[in-house]
Amino acid sequence: MDQDGEGVPVPRAPAADALVSSIDLGREVSDLDRRIMVALQQDGRASWTSIAEFAGASVSTVTRRGQQLLAEGVVRVGIVPTLGSEGHVESFLIRINCTPGSQVAVAEKLVESPYVRFVTLVTGKFDIFAEIVIPGDSAHFTRVLTGLQAIPGVERWRSDLLMHTYKVSFDWGRQLYDSHATAASDPQAYMPPPNTCDPTHFDDADRAIVAELRDNGRASFLSLASKLGVNESSVRRRYERMRAAGCLTTVTMIPASALGMSAETLLMVRVEPSRIDSVAQALAQHVSVRFLASSLEENSLYCEVILPTTETMHDFMTVTIAHLKGVRGWSASMELVFMKRGFIETPWWRSQVTTTDPAQISWDAAGSHP
């Protein structure tokens, strides 16, 4: 029996017609490419000059390679309003079982919803993990959640309130170049705490600027001014004011495989009630922990971890988590491909998920051998 008193389902593999593959750039990703990507995780709007200093290469080379990574869709930088900046919101962790073969179709519908901040296909007892952010009161919660539950292909739906977010970061790639890296990095790589931005900080001109930056977070102030029909200094001043007030979140999305990392895992860590905060504070110090929040369910912490290999993930679980005082146990799911993060759709997920006749999938195509 699992912790709900329910029979533990047999773990399901991905649907037979869904093959998840790594990103194929048609070329080798170099160490310089990776350094540029890690620098963009630190600050998605950093100048090519400052990125060149970190990467140890000329500005012209870094500019050319960086623009190529953006054009290829390997890196996407977007800027969105900080969670809660337009008023009170609540976040829900959603775990879904789908009818066989419908996982991708269900996930695609979730990607289309403006309430969905995060969507990923996973292994294990569930098929999909998602985060849904809903403004307003409980009546609105019911309308949104029941509406999404009606998506064709949803077989079982589990919703849990996320009570407190301890960490959201975008700089997990630092661990490639700093084996002693901790969470004490540039605050630009972190999402500001929710509800710290007064909604009065936004007017229609501010919203227009943020709307343009959503799909191209590296757009210059000059190009924004030209498109919006205002002067450059006004755009710059408004952007800096919103950023200083904690009203903006810079989202730099990079597939872990592009950085040579293969262990992306979602954990539900069960903790003694009196130890939830101390365990969360300890986990938040690890640069490999990208997201961490407390769940209403069973005194649990919901945690996303990104590490280089399965072996390093094994060490993280057995050496780090297992020895934290108060941890009772955990369940885990491997992320296969994430389709949306920070309310922004990833540009690569459709190429990673292909509909294929299972009889036509060779071992080489699947990236393995019998």
Regions found by a protein language model. Name each.
Residues 1-370:
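A compositional/biophysical signature of low hydrophobicity enriched in polar/charged and small residues
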